[in-house]
Amino acid sequence: MGAFFPVILLTPTPISSAHNLYLFQMLELQENITDSQPMDPPSLEIMMLHHLMIILVTLFGNTLLIYVIYKNNAVLRRKRVTPVQMLMLHMCAADILFALISVGPTMAITATVPFFYGPNLLCKLTKFLQVIPMYASSFLLVAISADRYQAICRPLASMKSSIYNRPALYSGIAWTAAILFSTPQLYLFEKRNGDCSENYTTALQYQLYVCLFNSVVWLLPSAIAGWLYLCVCKAVWKSTSFSSSLRNNMKKMEHMKLTEKNGGMQAHHKGATMQCVELDRRRVQTVKLTLTIVAANFVLWAPFCITSVIDAVWPTAINSTFATYIMFFGNLNSCMNPWLWFHFNRKQLKRACPCRKSSEPLIQSLVYVHVMTSEQSDF
């Protein structure tokens, strides 16, 4: 392992690598080891401030998203959350846990560097709990992708079972898998010489675990979600094109019939058309939202995961200070999801504001409420 980068991935997670790298740099300075550095390493204050900002922004954004979802359902008199909302609530839970049990303990450990004040059991439990939200977040993205694939690409099979059982099953599998994949942390870490550190027996074990971790938490979920969304986008494009053509033909036929009839039937036809348009819009909007969340997860985790693998197989290739700054990108993922949801659901965010009055036309509002309060709505 490299001269400056040997401990950044002792815990192959961005939150723990910050502590490990900073510990190494502190010991390096104490021993008066000098080497050329292209940039100054972040100070302890900067790292602590970064962790604190991640915690505050994550808690605020995800708590606000939970409030907006339930507030809108109350306004629309919907008794249950939709499948997408249910999975987004699970994502909020994973992000909140990341802030509390992943980043939070890291702040405490970083503040007490180079010592870990706690028994060996607490060391193992901390390392075990820290990675559960990371696995859960990635697996829940696959669950969202699979749910959209089932709802859009296989609608007949989806109708045979309850639309609420499917996301509950997918989210349950995601959390269970996250716990199972986190169990190696219980065996890899222990308290030694006052610090909670790894106990790899060989360099090959370290390399295999780092590569496996990054594959399971980033590469494989991204690949699976990408393939599912490729199928979803094709299905949505075909469905939208067919619906548009069908509506145009119906308009022509109905126009000929309605020219001799009263305006009441014209209003009924207009309402039915708007309902169809609203369903298509909701379908496309849902796909855009979930696809953007998956893409953001891939982009934000890519720098750290690629850096991790490079260090595992070629330790001298990357400067430790540069790798520390790269680490910051992965932590931003827990902050982004709520704001991406708000971007695609600005109307729901405005509706949740108690002081804002609705300015939607009456017929459009009625159509929207009918679509969104339908117990069979999958969006």
Curated annotation (Swiss-Prot):
Disulfide bond entries: 123-196
GO terms, molecular function: G protein-coupled receptor activity
A GO-annotated cellular component: membrane
Tissue: Detected in the left ASE gustatory neuron, the chemosensory neuron pairs ASH and ADF, and the PQR tail neuron. In males, detected in hook and tail sensory neurons involved in vulval sensing and hermaphrodite contact, and in spicule protractor muscles.
Chain segments annotated as coiled-coil in the UniProt record: none
Gene3D superfamilies: Rhodopsin 7-helix transmembrane proteins (1.20.1070.10)
Primary localization class, coarse: membrane
A Pfam family matched in the record: 7tm_1
Superkingdom, natural source: Eukaryota
SUPFAM superfamilies, alphabetized: Family A G protein-coupled receptor-like (SSF81321)
Membrane-side (Extracellular) residue stretches: 19-48, 117-124, 190-207, 311-320
Keyword Glycoprotein applies: yes
Record topology, Cytoplasmic segments: 70-95, 146-168, 229-289, 344-379
Transmembrane segments annotated in the record for this chain: 49-69, 96-116, 125-145, 169-189, 208-228, 290-310, 321-343
Presence of the UniProt keyword Transmembrane helix in the record: yes
Annotated keywords: Behavior, Cell membrane, Disulfide bond, G-protein coupled receptor, Glycoprotein, Membrane, Receptor, Transducer, Transmembrane, Transmembrane helix
Compartment annotation: Cell membrane
Positions glycosylated per UniProt: 32, 199, 319
Biological role: Receptor for nematocin. The activity of this receptor is mediated by G proteins which activate a phosphatidylinositol-calcium second messenger system. The activity of this receptor may be modulated by ntr-2, leading to reduced intracellular cAMP production. Plays a role in gustatory associative learning. Also plays a role in male mating behavior.
Protein name as annotated: Nematocin receptor 1
Organism in which the protein naturally occurs: Caenorhabditis elegans
